[in-house]
């Protein structure tokens, strides 16, 4: 097997660049460049000398002997000065060693998986942790890296295997006196309880998608109610055209924000009204579709001249807000909140209300939830097999046990305990090269 190397510390130039190595030739390479093998897991400061005798850099080197390393192989890290020329010269030197090459994307993590240092849930959590941009995404990723999810899935799989063992005992030893009669009848209640736990876990995972993918907030209302002004004030810059002419927003305008630690996808839509303009009609249809898919609809009214708006059916929470408070400074209880997007009057209260909504939605997510669609899909497949074993009482007992075996395999594929070779390239290609 090759020894692999890569920059693991990010973009250059930087104050420090970390070069990671892993593989069977690490000891030889470290001894050659450092002139010695540093004490395991201790930082060693010294000059790095190329094999032609030229000076490479003064650096910190740390050696991690197998199996006590990230990959489970011999590993080393070189902490160099982060100049591009310094790093490129060092990488060139590493490439001159026989059997040493630059790592592919995610190859360090893949080796960690192959050596049993990570399971697939932890590997996916690690990828999500690296990509996390918000506190909610970080929290969701940590659920995966902690190992608690893996423990849960393996516990559920063990329970299914135990149930199958009881059933097969009845099938194989039904004539033996020391095997209780119809022992399998006594364990189907446990299977039902497990199925209930899986269904709730799936529901939690679907709710948790907002932490990873973000909340969809749609600004809707009649033309000239101030929707684009709200969009611009939330963005802190001009991103939507604001004019006195009605119907200027004809396509949905989307923007990404972070509110209350959650990623938000904010959409400004065409004004709802009857029109003969074909292009504007198309824009209104697009607006209706965004409303149907939203988590929150901010239905904006001009409080000086409010116009009725009929929204399409949606499961979203709907706020009826009054805009243009600067022109009509009276408190009207028919609005969820009143403000002026133009002047900013009371707009800070509107933002606090939005942040509170985000916090509330984030708090609905449990502490242990599946973070990936792959995990959710396999959980759903497992539930389907368990339901088949529970619902079809007329099936031969051996066939019901087979459904439980298939459910157990689906749970095993989540963690990688069951062969998932065909998925590894897809999963680890999401990592950066140095991970």
Swiss-Prot record:
(6S)-5-formyl-5,6,7,8-tetrahydrofolate binds at residues 20, 77, 117, 435. InterPro entries: G_TrmE, GTP-bd, GTP-bd_TrmE_N, GTPase_MnmE, MnmE_dom2, MnmE_helical, P-loop_NTPase, Small_GTP-bd. Keywords: Cytoplasm, GTP-binding, Hydrolase, Magnesium, Metal-binding, Nucleotide-binding, Potassium, tRNA processing. Binds 1 potassium ion per subunit. Its EC number is 3.6.-.-. GO terms for molecular function: GTP binding; GTPase activity; metal ion binding. It is found in: Cytoplasm. Its cofactor is K(+). Pfam families: MMR_HSR1 (PF01926), MnmE_helical (PF12631), TrmE_N (PF10396). Mg(2+) binds at residues 228, 249. GO terms for cellular component: cytoplasm. Residues 214-359 form the TrmE-type G domain. GTP binds at residues 224-229, 243-249, 268-271. One of its GO terms (biological process) is tRNA methylation. Belongs to the TRAFAC class TrmE-Era-EngA-EngB-Septin-like GTPase superfamily. TrmE GTPase family. Exhibits a very high intrinsic GTPase hydrolysis rate. Involved in the addition of a carboxymethylaminomethyl (cmnm) group at the wobble position (U34) of certain tRNAs, forming tRNA-cmnm(5)s(2)U34. Homodimer. Heterotetramer of two MnmE and two MnmG subunits. This is tRNA modification GTPase MnmE.
